[in-house]
């Protein structure tokens, strides 16, 4: 704030009473939009109808391509916006990098950990909510190929 000493002193009087807190106007917008808890539940059902097929696409590709191979495991969420994928220890960053080489940009490996530091370098958060179903089908294939390539490299190190 650029002002004279007198104007700064005056502004400080008013700013003194400001608090950091919840955005009350945004809360009011939500209350008016949803009306009540049932309105929110109905709205979230609409979200689920949009997101469910996307999650099913990714889970299906993971199960068909990686199921039973012992090189990864994943969550099957019944809500939320992410699938948690656990690769072999020491592989997550390399998998995300390999996917990026093929044009797939993902959330950074270990993003679910404080400061993004996964001590096992194994966790990858998959967010299937944004891409179209067509893009997601291609992205899931790129991801599983990246998992397979990096896992083979890791196994050959032993």
Feature map (PLM): residue ranges:
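Conserved core segment of the aminotransferase class I/II
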Residues: 1-52
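Helix N-cap motif at beta-to-alpha junctions
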Residues: 5, 88-91, 131-133
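Residue-level detector of anion-binding/catalytic polar loops
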Residues: 104-105
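PLP-dependent enzyme catalytic core of the Aspartate aminotransferase-like
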Residues: 101, 117-158
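Inter-domain helical "communication" segments and dimerization helices
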Residues: 12, 32-44, 63-64, 68, ...
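Conserved glycine-rich beta-strand-loop-beta hairpin in the small C-terminal domain of fold type I
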Residues: 48-59, 71-86
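Short hydrophobic/aromatic beta-strand micro-patches
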Residues: 2, 84-86, 127-129
């Amino acid at each position: 704030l650029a002002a004279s000493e007198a104007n700064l002193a005056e502004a400080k009087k008013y700013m003194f009473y400001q608090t950091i807190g919840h955005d009350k106007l945004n809360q009011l917008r939500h209350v008016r939009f949803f009306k009540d808890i049932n309105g929110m539940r109905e709205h979230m059902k609409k979200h689920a109808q949009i997101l469910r097929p996307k999650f099913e696409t990714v889970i299906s590709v993971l199960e068909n391509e990686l199921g039973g191979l012992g090189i990864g495991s994943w969550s099957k969420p019944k809500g939320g916006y992410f699938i948690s994928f656990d690769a072999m220890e020491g592989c997550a960053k390399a998998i995300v990098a390999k996917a990026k080489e093929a044009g797939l940009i993902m959330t950074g490996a270990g993003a679910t950990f404080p400061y993004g530091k996964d001590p096992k370098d194994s966790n990858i958060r998959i967010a299937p909510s944004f891409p179209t179903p067509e893009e997601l089908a291609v992205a899931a294939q790129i991801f599983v190929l990246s998992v397979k390539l990096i896992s083979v490299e890791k196994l050959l190190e032993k």
